[in-house]
Amino acid sequence: MAVPARHTSSAKKNRRRTHYKLTAPTVTFDETTGDYRHSHRVSLKGYYKGRKVRDTK
């Protein structure tokens, strides 16, 4: 079974983890409905790129 030859120090571990970052979600203003929505997603009212693509209740 493979075993690490040396103990990984906390500094080495933290330097490796510096690239694990959270990014803020991309939110855009939907001119059709007047609401904010995520980019490349259907709005809550069923519109995508200005067209009705889903029926909502």
Swiss-Prot record:
Residue span of region Disordered: 1-23
| GO MF terms, alphabetically ordered | structural constituent of ribosome
Comp. bias intervals (Basic residues): 9-20
- Disulfide partners: none
Which terms in the GO cellular component ontology are assigned?
Answer: large ribosomal subunit
Q: Name one GO biological process term.
A: translation
InterPro entries (UniProt xref): Ribosomal_bL32, Ribosomal_bL32_bact, Ribosomal_zn-bd
Q: Which family does it belong to?
A: Belongs to the bacterial ribosomal protein bL32 family.
Full protein name:
Large ribosomal subunit protein bL32
**In which organism is this protein found?**
Lactococcus lactis subsp. lactis (strain IL1403) (Streptococcus lactis)
Q: What is the lineage of its organism?
A: Bacteria, Bacillati, Bacillota, Bacilli, Lactobacillales
